[in-house]
Amino acid sequence: MGLPWYRVHTVVLNDPGRLIAVHLMHTALVSGWAGSMALYELAVFDPSDPVLDPMWRQGMFVIPFMTRLGITKSWGGWSITGETVTNAGIWSYEGVAAVHIVLSGLLFLAAIWHWVYWDLELFRDERTGKPSLDLPKIFGIHLFLSGVLCFGFGAFHVTGLFGPGIWVSDPYGLTGKVEPVAPAWGAEGFDPFVPGGIASHHIAAGILGILAGLFHLSVRPPQRLYKGLRMGNVETVLSSSIAAVFFAAFVVAGTMWYGSAATPIELFGPTRYQWDQGFFQQEIDRRIRSSKAENLSLSEAWSKIPEKLAFYDYIGNNPAKGGLFRAGAMDNGDGIAVGWLGHAVFKDKEGHELFVRRMPTFFETFPVVLVDEEGIVRADIPFRRAESKYSVEQVGVIVEFYGGELDGVSFSDPVTVKKYARRAQLGEIFEFDRATLKSDGVFRSSPRGWFTFGHATFALLFFFGHIWHGARTLFRDVFAGIDSDLDAQVEFGAFEKLGDPTTKRQVV
């Protein structure tokens, strides 16, 4: 039988043994990829500077997912938070990678076994002796087992009852660590930024799944519903499974892009909305005003700002700044951050403090404009010097640095002032090493951007797959060419392939 490439899956349509085999092989490939990718990332990951060169700047993709579940130590003697480790144990990054690779091998062997021993009595109807699957019963079993797993994760792993807990941090991504989380059963549990909601929702969903599984194991579907939803057809299973997967993909694309407790910024990088809303800038401003209220000097106030917080307030860490087709990590774009130069304060010759207008997310270039505290334009870098009125030279702008490496240093040279004004457009000013990785200076997206793009794209494709297979199973008789005016109630091709001349057309 010659099948076109897009129809090859027909070979497992009525072959439950080999259907199991191909699913085992698929799981083996997924598990093997995860373990291998983890080992590759560990081989290229530099853990030496968790503040200025975190995992998300280095383009790590699977390490953040391991970390948010409680893995923080490596057999290489380092931990994600910067401490030295002597005995990482089996539940280290390498340990988890090895477990996935071993599991992949076992699944591979199981897939081969099921491919060879495909014709098991388990899959045959005792009454007819033909291959058949009790799909509603299988659905109940799967629902029950996934409910147990979901409940176990929420009740034991996340809460720390039997497990490490999950990664928890403050809203500004400064104090993150793995810790047990108590379930949040009130309205706050529905806040996507409250970690307790992860525990309570898994517990609640798990209980619901267990009860629903038991229901489907003990209650048979009515005949009208069974036939109406084509519950005897394995393509119905495919269609509804695709629906579950694309729905989950859309949800996680949203929680990743907009941010949530499940996608901490220390592991995946900040969101674009934190730049758009000046989230970190406002927190820095609040801290400076608080320090000034304690009669600290500007230099002392800015020196108290954590370098980590200042680094978040830099447009190069915005995942929406990198083009989707610019391959590579953020470090391959603007370079490896070496140090914070300090906060630049601009003043004109009349003593007005000037603020550089920050570049919006979707601009590649943006005019350099300096405004006073009332929003009045006082200086700029003109496009045409012949018509300029507010140039740095004419207005006499100087720049002073507070905190960071240039603390207390000021510049009045127009060329230098303009250089720092351009860089202040991009947020706090940092020094970057572009030589080590031959970085090209073009912004890249973070794993947050890649994950969102990938899952949103595949969710859309899977949505069409759901429609396609759902239509095929619901209108199977129409597509098979059965006369719609046929008086006899016929169950056509329930367990046999379409076009099989031995298929019985039995009047029900």
From Swiss-Prot:
NCBIfam families named in the record: PS_II_CP47
Cofactor note: Binds multiple chlorophylls. PSII binds additional chlorophylls, carotenoids and specific lipids.
Subunit structure: PSII is composed of 1 copy each of membrane proteins PsbA, PsbB, PsbC, PsbD, PsbE, PsbF, PsbH, PsbI, PsbJ, PsbK, PsbL, PsbM, PsbT, PsbX, PsbY, PsbZ, Psb30/Ycf12, at least 3 peripheral proteins of the oxygen-evolving complex and a large number of cofactors. It forms dimeric complexes.
Membrane association type: Multi-pass membrane protein
GO annotations of cellular component type: chloroplast thylakoid membrane; photosystem II
Functional description taken from the UniProt entry: One of the components of the core complex of photosystem II (PSII). It binds chlorophyll and helps catalyze the primary light-induced photochemical processes of PSII. PSII is a light-driven water:plastoquinone oxidoreductase, using light energy to abstract electrons from H(2)O, generating O(2) and a proton gradient subsequently used for ATP formation.
Keywords for this protein: Chlorophyll, Chloroplast, Chromophore, Membrane, Photosynthesis, Photosystem II, Plastid, Thylakoid, Transmembrane, Transmembrane helix
Protein name: Photosystem II CP47 reaction center protein
PANTHER family: PHOTOSYSTEM II CP43 REACTION CENTER PROTEIN
Pfam families referenced in this protein's UniProt entry, alphabetically: PSII
Family the UniProt entry places it in: Belongs to the PsbB/PsbC family. PsbB subfamily.
Signal sequence, renumbered to the chain: none
Subcellular location: Plastid, Chloroplast thylakoid membrane
Keyword Methyltransferase: no
One GO MF term: chlorophyll binding
A single BP term in Gene Ontology: photosynthetic electron transport in photosystem II
Residues passing through the membrane, by range: 21-36, 101-115, 140-156, 203-218, 237-252, 457-472
InterPro entries: PS_antenna-like (IPR000932), PS_II_antenna-like_sf (IPR036001), PSII_PsbB (IPR017486)
Underlying gene: psbB
